[in-house]
Structure formats: C-alpha cells, structure tokens
A protein has these predicted regions:
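Small cysteine-rich, disulfide-bonded extracellular modules of the LU/uPAR three-finger superfamily
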Residues: 1-97, 104-131
Length: 131
C-alpha cells in the first residue's frame, strides 16, 4: 500500500500561487528517494518539480489529473481527483517508486509539488500493463 507524504511548501504555494479550481495537476514518476535528490524537494523552499529526478514518459499514457471536487473546512483543504490509470504502451515505464502530484500551471514557483506517494519498492510497467 502506498503512503502519502505532504510537501511542506505546498501550504505556502497553494495559498499564494495556486488556483485549485482552474489549475492543471499532473503526476510525476521518480525512482529517486526525495532525501537522496541533490536538492531534496521535501526541504523548505525546494518543493518544486525541478528538484525531482523523473523517469522517461515516452511510453506512458497521460498523467494529467482531473479535479473531482475541492473543499476547505477549518483551514484544511481537501482536493479529490478522479481516478486515473497509467498505461505503458510501446515499451516499459520505470522503474519508479515515488509518484508526485504537482501543479503544472504556476510559473513562480514553477510546478510546485503538493505531495507524493511512496510505494515502498520500485515497480516497472511493461508494455500493456497499468497502474
């Protein structure tokens, strides 16, 4: 089972640069542990996609998320996305262990990270396989 981890910078970025209702959110795949990146994306001020080593997406289906609903209660933002299926086509995708959610719309900071899922071990999607 995957474990969700919030990126601390998202609290600041979501308030200052994100428009939850209209922005485009995308998944990014990585096989590099956040703490092993040359600039860890979990560090203060580093929560952007540029600090994540991504896998090649040549054989991967669309990674764009569709917002199902969002709400805010007592300072807690809840953002729900429709289910998404990633499919490898024409070759493999990965290996990857971490799946980041980032906001693809803001330009400053560009591509702020909301959080990531840690699957506990690396996986590779072979052609025709889905996640």
């Amino acid at each position: 089972m995957a474990t969700y981890n919030k990126i601390a910078d998202w609290a600041v970025n979501s308030e200052k640069t994100a428009n939850i209702g209209t922005d485009t959110f995308v998944l990014a795949l990585s096989n590099t542990a956040p703490g092993s990146e040359s600039t860890p994306p979990t560090g203060d001020g580093n929560g952007v996609l540029a600090n994540v080593t991504q896998v090649s997406y040549t054989n991967c289906s669309s990674r764009t998320l569709t917002t199902a609903s969002s709400s805010q209660t007592s300072g807690t933002l809840k953002l729900d996305f429709n289910d998404i299926t990633l499919t490898a086509s024409g070759g493999s995708v990965g290996p990857f262990r971490y799946i980041y959610i980032y906001d693809d719309t803001p330009t400053s900071p560009a591509d702020p990270l909301g959080g990531y899922y840690d699957y506990g071990s690396s996986t590779t999607l072979s052609a025709g396989e889905t996640l």
